[in-house]
């Protein structure tokens, strides 16, 4: 198949030769033809060498490469890439695990499918496009996914409201590409715990599957502790803390809907358990009035920075938030603190936490350095795929 052609400026092919999948608009010399946004294009070096095939998009990232050779983007291509991603999850023991039916099946560049995310919740796949090209390909991808998983897959929900470029002229509606809404509550299981998943109206695909291993680690620290879970959203950390034997768990979120989700998930797993309380309140306001009763605190805020132009303000926010936690946590307490901002580097985040600790004059030791789980694999050629970073700290 013949695709529109994009030619790069001289010496702008180096990153592609190192297998980085992004081509920035400043590297483009000319475009032969008039490809529509989201179209498949071929990319060439200035000397005419074919560099790869990818999705064209208007914006800072002009092309997201799907392959670094000459290929046809057809059903066989989508099926091959999805099978590769699925095989990895099988190797990790995530598919049809007896006490776990919740995992990420496709993680963008890490699975050589830039701009695509697919999360599995039992027999439902929730698909999210982060590029116009993946949006246009959504039905082809759904067809390949159904062929791969067969009857194990009963529904595919496409949810890309908020993840597609707002300037793109797209006729977009979140919808079921397979199956339909069956009514009632959607439930999924993570390590033997049940969670209500709202992929229709919830954040992301309905649940933060990237914190699975970190929630499991927190469970090991929770025994006989008084736990504060800030930015609780669906209450994942709270539920794990309760199973870990926490003396009391307080969940805080500025969203009353998030608080309701947390209370529902606690009730699903620990009905009539009076150890849990939830508060709909601003995080800083709550920490300001809180006593010094907590000996395990979780800080898992939403992304403070999605663009580099607000990085400085984001780092100040992390410093302020962690300082407030350091001031409140009891001696010998444990702090789980996270950043999910891709533009905040691991070193930047650690420096912000260090500054907060120094400001409060607490003695702090690093026990664990955390990241995203293996079903969010990072291509060694695309370090930008590592976005989640966390620290587990012992505070004297």
Go through the PLM ranges and name each one:
Residues 234-247:
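Conserved SAM-binding loop of SAM-dependent methyltransferases across substrates and taxa
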Residues 248-253:
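Conserved SAM-binding motif I beta-strand of class I
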Residues 257-298:
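S-adenosyl-L-methionine
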Residues 294-324:
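Mobile active-site "lid"/loop adjacent to the S-adenosyl-L-methionine
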Residues 334-396:
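C-terminal catalytic and target-recognition region of SAM-dependent MTase-like enzymes
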């Amino acid at each position: 198949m013949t695709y529109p052609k994009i030619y790069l400026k001289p010496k702008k092919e180096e990153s592609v030769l190192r297998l980085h999948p992004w081509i920035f608009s400043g590297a483009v010399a000319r475009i032969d033809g008039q490809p529509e946004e989201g179209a498949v294009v071929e990319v060439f070096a200035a000397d005419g060498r074919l560099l790869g095939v990818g999705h064209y998009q208007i914006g800072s990232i002009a092309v997201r490469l799907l392959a670094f050779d000459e290929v046809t983007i057809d059903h066989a291509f989508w099926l091959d890439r999805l099978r590769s991603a699925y095989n990895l999850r099988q190797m990790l023991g995530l598919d049809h695990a007896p006490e776990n039916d919740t995992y990420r099946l496709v993680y963008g560049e890490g699975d050589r499918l830039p701009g695509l995310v697919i999360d599995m919740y039992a027999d439902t796949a929730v698909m999210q496009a982060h590029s116009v090209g993946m949006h246009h390909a959504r039905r082809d991808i759904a067809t390949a996914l159904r062929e791969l998983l067969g009857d194990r897959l009963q529904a595919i929900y496409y949810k890309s409201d908020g993840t597609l470029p707002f300037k793109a002229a797209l006729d977009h509606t979140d919808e079921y590409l397979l199956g339909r809404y069956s009514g009632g509550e959607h439930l999924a299981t993570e390590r033997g715990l049940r969670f209500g998943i709202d992929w229709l109206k919830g954040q992301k695909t309905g649940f933060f599957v990237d914190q699975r291993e970190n929630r499991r680690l927190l469970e090991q620290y929770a025994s006989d502790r008084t736990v504060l879970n800030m930015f609780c959203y669906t209450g994942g950390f709270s539920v794990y803390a309760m199973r870990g034997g926490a003396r009391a768990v307080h969940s805080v979120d500025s969203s009353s809907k998030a608080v309701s989700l947390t209370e529902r998930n606690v009730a699903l797993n620990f009905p009539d358990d009076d150890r849990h309380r939830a508060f709909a309140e601003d995080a800083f306001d709550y920490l300001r009035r809180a006593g010094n009763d907590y000996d395990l605190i979780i800080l898992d805020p939403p992304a403070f920075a999605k663009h580099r132009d607000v990085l400085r303000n984001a780092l100040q926010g992390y410093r302020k938030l962690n300082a407030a936690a350091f001031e409140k946590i009891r001696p010998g307490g444990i702090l789980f603190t996270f950043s999910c901002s891709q533009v905040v580097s691991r070193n930047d985040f650690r420096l912000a936490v260090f500054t907060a600790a120094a400001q409060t004059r607490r003695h702090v030791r690093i026990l664990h350095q955390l990241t995203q789980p293996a079903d969010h694999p990072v291509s060694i050629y695309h370090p930008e795929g590592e976005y989640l970073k966390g620290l587990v700290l012992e505070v004297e």
